[in-house]
Amino acid sequence: MGRRLILDTTVLIAYERETIDRSALDDDELAVASISVAGYRAGIELADTVDRAAERARALTAITSTVDVLDYTEATAAHHGRLLAHVRRSGTARGAHDLIIAAHAAETGRTVLSHDAKARFGDLPGVTFLDARSLATRSS
């Protein structure tokens, strides 16, 4: 078994667009937070064409059928609260959804895989980060 990873929404989008080397994740244990599924579903709802919405829906089904979808539980809330307190004390603004993803990562001992280096997941206590740009396909 390879790495234990949690994919954020940017990676779901890269999966759909085929701009990430999926084979690089073959040996890894993958999960996605339900908040990321919600963010991706918003993209389905906002698609500019019916065909595009259908493509996105198919991609999401393919992803969620092969990875664990993590629900927000009381244990997740405990990690989330700790991270909220940390960012408030440090005065560093963070995305609300990013903190939920980070809470799942801390709770489950997973590394956050994201294209969003600005989210600074690795700066959060108990959270590790892997830059998904290292897994980009050659054409992206």
Regions found by a protein language model. Give the residues of each.
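Generic structural signal for small/hydrophobic residues in well-ordered secondary structure
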Residues: 8-9, 40, 80, 105
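A generic structural signal for short hydrophobic patches within well-formed alpha-helices
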Residues: 12, 37-40, 77, 118-120
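Acidic, PIN/NYN-like endoribonuclease modules and their adjacent C-terminal/linker elements
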Residues: 102, 106-140
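Short, structured coil segments at secondary-structure junctions
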Residues: 26, 65, 124-125
